[in-house]
């Protein structure tokens, strides 16, 4: 993996990072790296995320999924970090893009349509919740379990559970003697893609989880006390410096359909980790080349508050374009889709500094297990670095907890400080049939 920061320098873009300040930034990286390494060595909460590879045993995961290894598809019941890592990996690497479906929302229509479209006898259940009490996850699991029972499928023979040492989900797993894997200690869910939390569906679908871990290890080995020597830290340092310069939106734009969910995973990682104390880049999601025809207009000509992060594989499978039968399409003769998307990538990246707007480029070798594992670990490390540079509590999410507490209180009919805010919030409804 390599990172190109040239289009984010002040000589190319505004906002941008002055080349003369890179050495000062590098000194900050060295200090932050030392603090990160101290946290890793002590196994401190959150910093233990970067030690996850050492604690993840692929053989244990293979053993747990063995009873469902014949499944043709997997349904993951989880939310946030309990689902997005697995979704990103399987979308990037599974032979059948529809073989992994995710229930990470409680929209009843979506849940119903998803279950109606599956052959449950051929589908494994992967349920993930650290606490075992996550409302959305447990509600969806109960619905899924009933669907299996209604179709005469023994759900206890088609399930793998990943959860903590206590809680209702752990009790259920113990009661039915279900295959169970632990959620790693000291690791927030959004940093757990390269653990059982993210690796169960790939393992069931025959994806090379050892390769994913090896790729993550490569990114770990590349961490160094200098942005000039570490692609992950180069990305994190530049993202931090660009936010300081005014780029408060980070639009992630992969040029590979199979990396579309990577943008979703990155959005949670970046927003939940760094959105603290009135700061943090807002992650946006785009897809190349599709969004050249929509969002690119904003990125080149809208507010100067954005950096676009381009992600692409250097090598990719190809499809030849048949010779056209119209002279206006003759420029496509002898070309292929890979050449076309690469040309669009180069043109779009160049279009941003041409409009005096910043861009960062992340290039992986190819869409294989090693490269995807390397990308995920590198972005996690970059996020940890940004948190250190910005001096925020990277591994907590207090603003998220407010909504969780309020939801539970509403469901239980309890009166709490949160429900009082809900009851008293100002409303001005337009379109009401009764007079305001």
UniProtKB/Swiss-Prot annotation:
Predominant localisation class: cytoplasm
Residues annotated as the enzyme's active site: 272 (proton donor), 293, 404
Gene Ontology molecular function: carbohydrate derivative binding; glucose-6-phosphate isomerase activity; monosaccharide binding
Subcellular locations according to the entry: Cytoplasm
PROSITE patterns: P_GLUCOSE_ISOMERASE_1, P_GLUCOSE_ISOMERASE_3
The protein's Enzyme Commission number: 5.3.1.9
Pfam family, one: PGI
A GO CC annotation given for this chain: cytosol
Pathway: Carbohydrate biosynthesis; gluconeogenesis; Carbohydrate degradation; glycolysis; D-glyceraldehyde 3-phosphate and glycerone phosphate from D-glucose: step 2/4
InterPro entries registered for this protein in UniProt: G6P_Isomerase, Phosphoglucose_isomerase_CS, SIS_dom_sf, SIS_PGI_1, SIS_PGI_2
PANTHER family documented for this protein: GLUCOSE-6-PHOSPHATE ISOMERASE
Protein name, as recorded: Probable glucose-6-phosphate isomerase
Species name: Haloarcula marismortui (strain ATCC 43049 / DSM 3752 / JCM 8966 / VKM B-1809)
Gene name tied to this protein: pgi
